[in-house]
């Protein structure tokens, strides 16, 4: 006998699919933490065809703007891009539409621009505001005069409630996935240009301190970059699939 379509069943099935996908990703991430090799991690998921989330990934700096220079002389822009590309791969495998502000070592400015930094920031904001994104993740690395400072931290626009939720979810994942002893919390900021001039829920993820010898070394290792990308992906998917966007 053909079963009647009960109202709400399709919606419930979609929610179940999203939860199952999130659980599968979590299990894959847990297995990845204990893996020391460079294997490529894959998982199966049942895509929700009625809902495809759009995520903008913004690798900070690039081109003639190196960002911070690590204690090991590694420029921040290279670490940002490496983590961002890994994050892109993971989110795309989870059926997200990913828009990158840059995919090479190139700034978003023209050679003739008088102020290339301002031109770059304007271009990034245009990409984000035209994207209709459910979430925006800007990847950066921190630095401080004291070499002892360490730990990932997420920043959000002070007046953005959705940005705050996204930041708190990501901060929790970064602490549990990278360093349980990290006591930093998600922090509001009212000064960052891109946070003030974008419409979608946006956060700036400072993945670690390039001024700290230990973290600077880790952040240049592909396996650790992948681990950072997984934690950020896990938090991002938790945010969008939870209906916060």
Label each region the model flagged.
Residues 1-245:
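Catalytic-site microenvironment of enzymes
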